[in-house]
Amino acid sequence: MSKASIKLAFSDKYDHEHSLHYLEKHQDGMARKLSDYRDQQLARRALALAGGPNLVLDLPCGAGRFWSTLAEQPNRIILAADNSADMLATAMAAQPKHITEHVRTLQTSAFDINLPDNSVDSIFCMRLLHHIEKPEHRLALLKEFHRTTRDSVIISLWVDGNYKAWRRKALEKKRARRGRAHENSNRFVINRTTVEQEFIEAGFNIQTHLDFLASYSMWRVYVLRKNN
């Protein structure tokens, strides 16, 4: 299986309209604003733990939700990459100039990154891995990240072993009994031991992890270091 042949089911949906919706949804209501605040906290801490990398590949960058946090380090260059040209255009138009002056854009697939080996200090990958169900696809992604980064990867995903994961599993069983198993079928909870073994197999050491809300939330951020 070639890297270029891997394509996620939702990857073509982000036209201009969907990109605008994606930009707006994380500021829609108090709950999402608080969630975004916590996401930014975790991102800031993970970047510090990774040593404050200067050249960061934000992939997928989406609508630039994390750019203000990434740009807090004045000498940092943000290489913002996404599979969707519309998403990149939306992000550049929406974010203020003092943020975008730190940003260079790149349209590329996360599975086949159009960059040389060891070309960035860190890869910052938020809210992608929980969309990837197949272990072989996750491993292909992680190996491509290992090829491209010189040092670290910051990556978020849904893990098991918490209340939200238990609740989601119960809901999925209920949907299956009602013949509605296909609903929300593009997001997946990953076993912690399984994904940590995949990190190691791809050539990374696990420096640490940060939980959105320990024992309750599925969201976890890992800081990985390249094993040279």
Language model region names:
Residues F124:
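A conserved beta-strand element that flanks and buttresses the S-adenosyl-L-methionine
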Residues D112-D117:
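Short conserved loop adjoining the S-adenosyl-L-methionine
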Residues R150-W158:
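Conserved beta-strand signature within the Rossmann-like core of class I S-adenosyl-L-methionine
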Residues L57, A63-F111:
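Class I SAM-dependent methyltransferase SAM/SAH-binding core
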Residues L139-D151:
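A short glycine-rich, Lys/Arg-flanked "PGG" loop and its adjoining helix->strand segment in the class I
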Residues M1-A50:
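Conserved class I S-adenosyl-L-methionine
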Residues V159-E201, T208-L210:
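C-terminal alpha-helical "lid/dimerization" subdomain adjacent to the S-adenosyl-L-methionine
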